Amino acid sequence: MNRQKITWLQILQGWSMLLVVIGHVTLTGIFENPQTPVSATIERVIYSFHMPLFMFISGFLFYFTKISRDLAYKEVVFDKLKRLGIPYLFFTFFTFAVKFIFSPFMKRPVELSLRQFTDSFLYPSSNPLSEMWFVATLFIIMLSYPLLKYMITGHFKIAVLIIGSVVLNLFFPPDIFLLCLSNVAYMFLFFCLGILFCKFDIQRFLSHSGSLLLSLLLFIALNLIPDCPILLLNLTGIIFSVSLCLNLTPIVSGLFSSFRDYTFQIFLLGIFPQIAIRILYSKIPQNELSYWSLYIISILLGIYLPVFIAKIVEKIPNKLIRCCFGL
């Protein structure tokens, strides 16, 4: 993978993380609040594709860093336990402590019990840091490394993989919360698409301005259709995002460079200052000025406070501490 391809992917990572942070603002604590129609529309559009985009990027990187190098299964599992498992464990403990101390201010307070702690792993969506469902889902999908490596070795097997992934996405029961199995089934398709994009360099077809315009118009049109199938929104959002970042790379190659190398740390830490901003908003006079001022502050803090913390942690010589923060 040449430098330009790496750059577009870095921009895509920054873009996806920006979407996540904006999607987590929710100052009123009510998702898609009709009292704030502009931000509600922003939330609706972002949530139509941002997590599938994250999974697509993860699949792309998984092929580039693991599958293409034909790493041993135990090496892949050990690496992901270190990179995903340790932060999961650390931030589960950390969030339990924070939510217990500040329980009067929490929308989802916790109780310090063995049952709730165990459920945080068996049912990741119940984790005190709700975003951990994605980490658990990603880890479980990555455990299928031998299957994925085998299924992309021939055209027929690739066709079976795609069809099977679509079937899982559309028809797997949506309410199986044990080990995030419903999320695993839904997100598996986008992870596989990321793998295939990297393997076959499919993104080269999206690097032209015509592709960007067409994907943008299609994405807008589908978002304007009431009750549009969510899978179509997922896919068009991914295609538009990839094309956008490919087209931006020759123009602004340093876009998002101030935070795009710390996307996992932002994902883990960004929600905490954003929750603090929500609490602050609930305590002050609420008007357009205070809303949009804190909206912007929430985005900036959600991005740059984790970056600041990550840069400090990077300088700590203790490897375990760095691993706790995904570094």
Predicted feature residues:
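Alpha-helical transmembrane segments and their immediate juxtamembrane cytosolic regions
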Residues: 1-327
